[in-house]
From Swiss-Prot:
Gene Ontology terms, MF aspect: anthranilate synthase activity
This protein's UniProt keywords: Amino-acid biosynthesis, Aromatic amino acid biosynthesis, Chloroplast, Lyase, Plastid, Transit peptide, Tryptophan biosynthesis
General function of this protein: Part of a heterotetrameric complex that catalyzes the two-step biosynthesis of anthranilate, an intermediate in the biosynthesis of L-tryptophan. In the first step, the glutamine-binding beta subunit of anthranilate synthase (AS) provides the glutamine amidotransferase activity which generates ammonia as a substrate that, along with chorismate, is used in the second step, catalyzed by the large alpha subunit of AS to produce anthranilate.
Domain of life from the UniProt record: Eukaryota
Family matches, as SUPFAM superfamilies: ADC synthase
GO cellular component: anthranilate synthase complex; chloroplast
Pfam families per UniProt: Anth_synt_I_N (PF04715), Chorismate_bind (PF00425)
Broad class of where this protein is predominantly found: plastid
Protein name: Anthranilate synthase alpha subunit 1, chloroplastic
Length: 577
């Protein structure tokens, strides 16, 4: 897949997907100082930069980028994240996005990785209660909002970003965060109101967004790193002051990446067979019998013509002394995917390896990519080919996929210009680390009177995690699952200053709540005391007329156990040492 402007399909660290990279020994200070010299601009370049900045402000641009390009051979994205966010600062909003792109013949390392920390602004929504924090202006306001997604959109309407040459074709700044599955309740207020939602046992935000002015973009093809700071002119008394402050902020960001005291990453060895499932997960939001009863109930609704399909999920719980960032480092090895993410948000940390976009808008083109239909990977290319044909000849899985393509066409069509919706690709097979999926691509041209936020509202949640018809399926999910889903099956990603959007579907995503618990344990055997974390691994199965309850329950177990292997690896590498 070609790199998209402001896409979050970004790349693994260099060196590729290893646990031990990033430890500098010996002449670390000298390395840092030499690297730092590459950030300097000569006098001519400084004058040119200042001239372009002031010209942009004179033309009415109120958000303007300043950037430096540095060598990246002394730094990895994982280490860069740790330079910006201390190990003990686990509630500081921040993110690391990476990617391995998939295709019919296997995997390719994505071109870009993106790191962000210290958002200038945050939006936190819980049901209809919204808190907006502007850290730059040191202000906070709380308000009731029928649709909190209109708030970031209204803020974006005030933006006039400067478009400059030299920025990479990746996400370079803007909103980053997550949208829970339950944000659908802002749209379907009558059929899916918050008042009728299942039990909210974790009290997580429904939306968390941070506005990131400081961004570090790794280009793994050109072997360089773009360090970017966006300047808000409205926060300063003059353009001159804005430029000088912006330069100082950029230099401060660079100095954190080039500090003499660069943090170290714990080295590790891969001791486990990462292709195997993780340890059995004993604790779930539903017992085996309760889940099987829910499958039977769903089939009754299908046979009655109430729905065609519904996705029933259950949330598994795993306790671990592995830190969430260690789990992310392990997940990069266990399950490299198009949307790798470590996202520290308010109330939780997301560790994700999603294979699928929720929605993408680039230059007003909407993209929806249904991913449904699964079979295991073969042990050889020849076996892969055999299994691929077996998957494409599976009538049940192909019928489900076509149904979801139709749902995708409907979602895109709601916000597209008449006649612009197309199925660009139909039923391609993509290979991932452990499985193969059937994939299709639906596109459309966004209507002139709408924005990317409307495309997100139309898509969320996608049919692959809800069912068909979508709203009726979600009503049944509320009745049968018993707990609010939270981030699972919602989306995470970014919306750029230019208005492009790339949101991944929150599948294969581990949720670590950060709120204190009365039963948290501690380990004092390590050099540093370790806190016990609760990891939530949620997985679902698509229920159709001929579904077998035992098989669907086992599918949930297998999906969650595959994700749990990352926790096993993190424990064996970082905790048990």
């Amino acid at each position: 897949m070609a790199s998209l402007v402001l896409s979050l399909r970004i790349a693994p660290s260099t060196p590729p997907l290893g646990l031990g990279g990033g430890r500098f020994r010996g002449r670390r200070g000298a390395v840092a100082c030499r690297a730092a010299t590459f950030q300097q601009l000569d006098a001519v370049a400084v004058r040119e930069e200042e001239s372009k900045f002031k010209a942009g402000a004179a033309e009415g641009c109120n958000i303007l980028p300043l950037k430096r390009c540095i060598f990246s051979d002394h730094l990895t994205p994982v280490l860069a994240y740790r330079c910006l966010v201390r190990e003990d600062d686990r509630e500081a909003p921040s993110f690391l996005f990476e990617s391995v792109e998939q295709g019919s013949e296997g995997t390719n390392v994505g071109r870009y990785s993106v790191v962000g920390a210290q958002p200038a602004m945050e939006i936190v929504a819980k049901a209809n209660h919204v808190t907006v924090m502007d850290h730059k202006m040191k202000s906070r306001r709380e308000q009731f909002a029928p649709d909190p997604m209109k708030i970031p959109r209204s803020i974006m309407e005030q933006w006039n970003p400067q478009i400059v040459e030299g920025l990479p074709d990746a996400f370079c700044g803007g909103w980053v965060g997550f949208f829970s599955y339950d944000t659908v309740r802002y749209v379907e207020t009558k059929k899916l109101p918050f008042s009728n939602a299942p039990e909210d046992d974790r009290n997580l935000p429904d939306i968390h967004l941070g506005l990131y002015n400081d961004i570090v973009v790794f280009d793994h093809v050109e072997k360089k790193t773009h360090v970017i700071h966006w300047v808000r002119v409205d926060c300063h008394e003059s353009v001159d002051e804005a430029y000088e402050d912006g330069k100082n902020q950029l230099e401060a960001l660079l100095s954190r990446l080039h500090s003499v005291n660069v943090p170290t990453l714990t080295a590790g060895s891969v001791k486990l067979n990462v292709g195997q499932f993780g340890s059995a997960l004993q604790k779930s939001s539903m017992s085996r019998e309760d889940y099987k009863k829910a499958v039977v109930q769903a089939k009754e609704h299908i046979l009655a013509g109430d729905i065609f399909q519904v996705v029933l999920s259950q949330r598994f719980e795993r306790r671990t002394f592995a830190d969430p960032f260690e789990v992310y480092r392990a997940l990069r090895i266990v399950n490299p995917s198009p949307y790798m993410a470590y996202l520290q948000a308010r109330g939780c940390i997301l560790v994700a390896s999603s294979p699928e976009i929720l929605t993408r808008v680039e230059k007003r083109t909407i993209v929806n990519r249904p991913l449904a239909g699964t079979i295991r990977r073969g042990k050889s290319k020849a076996e892969d080919k055999v299994l691929e044909q077996l998957l494409l000849s599976d009538g049940k899985q192909c019928a489900e996929h076509i149904m979801l393509v139709d749902l995708g066409r409907n979602d895109v069509g709601k916000v597209s210009k008449p006649g612009s919706v197309k199925v660009e690709k139909l039923m391609n097979v993509e290979r991932y680390s452990h499985v193969m999926h059937i994939s299709s691509t639906v596109t459309g041209e966004l209507r002139d009177d709408l924005t990317c936020w409307d495309a997100l509202r139309a898509a969320l949640p996608v049919g692959t995690v809800s069912g068909a018809p979508k709203v009726r399926a979600m009503e049944l999910i509320d009745q049968m699952e018993g707990k609010m889903r939270g981030p699972y099956s919602g989306g995470f990603g970014g919306v750029s200053f230019r208005g492009d959007m790339d949101i991944a579907l929150a599948l294969r995503t581990i949720v670590f709540p950060t709120g204190s618990r009365f039963d948290t344990m501690y380990s004092y055997t390590d050099k540093n005391a370790r806190q016990e974390w609760v990891a939530h691994l949620q997985a679902g199965a698509g229920i159709v007329a001929d579904s077998k309850p035992d098989d669907e329950h086992q599918e949930c177990l297998n999906k969650a156990a595959g994700l749990a292997r990352a926790i096993d690896l993190a424990e064996s590498t970082f905790v048990d040492e």
